[in-house]
A protein has these predicted regions:
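Helix-start (N-cap) detector for alpha-helical repeat units in TPR-like alpha-solenoids
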Residues: 278, 312-313, 329, 346-347, ...
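Residue-level recognition of tetratricopeptide repeat
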Residues: 286, 320, 354-357, 391, ...
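Residue-level detector of the short coil/turn that links helix A to helix B
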Residues: 292, 326, 360-363, 397, ...
Length: 469
């Protein structure tokens, strides 16, 4: 009977998660709009944080409180909202140097500092939906035909859809230019990149609206505005400041990585074998991986590791390739090395935890649970980690914990009904008054409980009867 009940729970768990329990790499991530996806990558996020940090500091904002959101989209675009900086892969790939990227970020922070509002209707809709991020460039869930599940894998942040909600007047654009220039100067950065970025797209001004990049529909250009900005930044003391060799190298690595994942065929031509630079070799290794030639990819990753044995992202990449192509036992060691080299990166711990769970060894599954728990101490709203944890607890026969982890997953993807139902089921299987039981109760209370749910909680003393009306 217990076995039968557990089988029923497994079916319910799989249905609730809406996806297979096998993960595969790729960029088939959550769709935002036409040609847009939300993605995660520790290496790129770290580089973007370093680029953005002086800008936020100059604006009086703590960079540690800022979440960098990477959006896979061909067009260049960016937006800032409280606590969030959104950047498209198209912007990164088209920015010639870090200073151009920083210039666009400063312009967006200028809008934020100026209190320039998004289009009210769009922003209202945007603010009502959690922003859901996907797992990463290399490790995404294989979805069982569920677009809704695809939209809810990792973590939530405010202002979902803010890129589509922006719409500024020419006056607001000019003010944001001036504010951005001030921020860049205060940060000790040149405003040249900001002016040059907009000048590079001056031609967009004469295009019919349907032919323009979305960014330049929302941020209308004018020659007068560009010339005013050029005059302003050219007069600033730090105009001659240039990007450091280290910053330029990181920028090229970021672009090469994105090219390898997003444009593998193009990358093989863009970064041909004659180019022996690190970014080119990195791009080719990733491109072979994306073209499903694992042996060629691994050979090139191993060559890179011979030169950079302490690079956690190379070990991460090697582990991803091995995992995707079914070599789980071999994937464990490189993933352990990536975590050892960068222990504060939750996505790397998730990769390791995922592999350990897939090995189906009791000790490995238990260790996988530990790794996922550590990842969740950094990103407690990481829905994919909760989903993996539910699978691990289910494998260990810990039904109460599996149901609680599933409730956490559903809560973080915004499905309050499923979150409440699984939290109620978890309470039935957890020791009363334990921390986990109390957490399940909290989820019930914040997941739109019915009057009957509240009456049941009041009857058992979990809440005061006066709270039930």
């Amino acid at each position: 009977m217990a076995s039968s009940a557990r089988s029923v729970f497994r079916v319910a768990l799989a249905a609730a998660l809406g996806l297979s329990l096998v993960l595969r790499p790729g960029l088939a991530a959550a769709q935002l709009g036409p040609g847009e996806t939300l993605i995660r990558d520790t290496e790129i996020e770290d580089i973007l944080h370093r680029d953005a940090a002086p800008i936020f500091q100059a604006a009086g904002i703590d960079p540690k409180g800022i979440q960098i959101v990477l959006i896979g989209a061909k067009d260049p675009n960016a937006a800032a909202a409280p606590g969030v900086m959104m950047v498209t892969t198209g912007l990164i790939l088209q920015a010639k140097n870090p200073n151009e990227l920083q210039g666009v970020m400063a312009h967006e922070v200028g809008h934020l500092a100026g209190g320039h509002s998004f289009r009210s209707g769009e922003m209202q809709r945007a603010g009502m939906v959690p922003m859901i991020l996907t797992m990463g460039l290399g490790v995404l869930a294989a979805l069982a035909g569920s677009g809704e599940a695809a939209a809810g894998l990792i973590s939530s942040a405010p202002y979902f859809g803010a890129l589509g909600a922006a719409g500024y007047s020419r006056e607001q654009e000019s003010r944001a230019d001036q504010a951005g220039a001030t921020i860049l100067e205060k940060a000790g950065l040149s405003g040249r990149g900001l002016a040059e970025f907009f000048d590079n797209y001056r031609y967009q001004e004469v295009f019919a609206q349907y032919r323009r990049y979305k960014y330049f529909i929302d941020h209308p250009l004018s020659s007068d505005r560009i010339e005013a900005l050029q005059s302003r930044v050219a007069a600033q003391p730090h105009y001659g400041q240039i990007d450091s060799p280290e910053a330029m190298a990181e920028h090229e690595v970021m672009k090469a990585k994105l090219d390898g994942f997003i444009n593998p065929q193009v990358s093989m031509t863009k970064y041909d074998e004659k180019d022996t630079s690190y970014p080119a070799r990195y791009a080719r290794a990733i491109a072979y991986y994306q073209m499903k030639e694992p042996d060629k990819a691994l050979k090139r990753v191993d060559a890179l590791l011979a030169d950079q044995p302490n690079n956690p992202y190379l070990w991460e990449l090697k582990g991803q390739i091995l995992f995707e192509f079914g070599r789980m036992n071999e994937a464990e060691e490189p993933q352990r090395k990536s975590v050892a080299l960068k222990p504060d990166a939750p996505l790397l711990r998730m990769n390791l935890g995922q592999t350990l769970i897939a090995l189906d060894d009791k000790k490995k599954v238990d260790e996988g649970i530990v790794e996922l728990r550590k990842a969740l101490t950094h990103e407690n709203d990481n829905a994919a980690a909760w989903r993996m944890l539910a699978e691990a607890y289910d494998k260990r026969g810990q039904e109460g914990m599996a149901r609680l982890a599933t409730a956490e997953y559903q809560f973080n993807v915004g499905d309050m009904r499923q979150a409440r139902e699984f939290a109620i089921r978890a309470r039935d299987r957890l020791p009363k008054d334990s921390p986990e039981w109390r957490r399940a109760t909290d989820i019930v209370l914040v997941s739109k409980p019915s009057k009957d749910d509240l009456k049941d909680l009041a009857r058992e003393g979990s809440i005061a009867g006066a709270q039930v009306r």
